[in-house]
Amino acid sequence: MTGAAPFVVGSPTLARMRLRLDLAYDGTDFHGWAAQPGLRTVEGELSAAITTVLRLAEPARLTVAGRTDAGVHAAGQVVHVDIEPDELERAVGHSGRRPEEALATRLRGVLPPDAVVHRVRVAPEGFDARFSAVSRRYRYLVCDDPARVDPLRRREVVSLRTPLDVDAMNSATRQLLGLRNFAAFCKKREGASTTRTLLRYDWTRREDGLLEASVLADAFCHSMVRALIGALVPVGTGARGTDFPAEVLTTGVRDPRVKVMPAHGLCLVEVGYPADDALAARALEARARREE
C-alpha cells in the first residue's frame, strides 16, 4: 500500500487502520444521517455497503463530521472507519487497484443512486472525522420569485412568495458572528453545549436569480443552521428589523417567532481540517470543549 502511513488504532497485536471517506448524498429519501432501526439512513446504507464489500464479521462503525437531519443534503461529507489491514485488502479482488481506490469503486457499485463515495484514503495520524474538524460550511438555497421557480430543482431549493432584501439580511447576520451561545437557535439536548463560533453568515444573489446563504462555523448544534436561516427570512421580507436575530440570540431560549426552515434547502458543502500535524491536538481540544 502506498501513500500516507496508515493511522493505526489500538495495540500492536490488534492493529487497525483508519480510513477517511469523502461522500455526497441527496437527503430527500433518507431519515437523516444517523442509523435508526427500521428507517433508511445514510449511515445505515454506507455501513451496510462497507460491511458487504469487505465481508466484515460485524457492521462497520462510522464516525461522521456532520450528522445531517432528515432531508438535508451533503456535497462534502466526511466519515472515518477503523478496519484491519487485511480486511481492506479484500476490496482489491482481481482489479489490481490500490486497496483504497478499489474500495471506493466497489462502494459506488453497491450504494444506492442517491449516495456516492467520491474518495477513500488512509487517514493521517490523529485524524478524527468529527473532532479534528475546524469548520463546517452549509449552503441554503431560496427562490423568492414565483415566476422563476424551477420544478427540476424542487428537491434542493425552497420557494418563497415574497422578495427578500439581501442587504438588510446581511446587515443582520453581521451581528451574529463570533463565539456565542446559540441556545436560542438550537433544539435543546440535555447536557449538550450550545456555544459555537460562527465564522461566516452571508447571503448572495446568484446569476440564476436564486438566493444562497453560506453559513460557516466550527460546529453546529441540532437544527441551528435552519433556525439561523429562519431568523433572517422575516428580516428580508421587512416583517422584522435588522436587530431581530441579535435580539433573539440574547434571550438564550427558542423563540416561536423564528421558523426552522425546511430541510431540503440545506446542504453540507465542506468540512475543514487543520494541517496533518495538528489533527490530534484539534481532536483533543474539541472533545474537551464538548464535555464542558
Q: Predicted regions: what is each one?
A:
Residues 2, 7-292:
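Structured-RNA-binding interfaces characteristic of tRNA pseudouridine synthases
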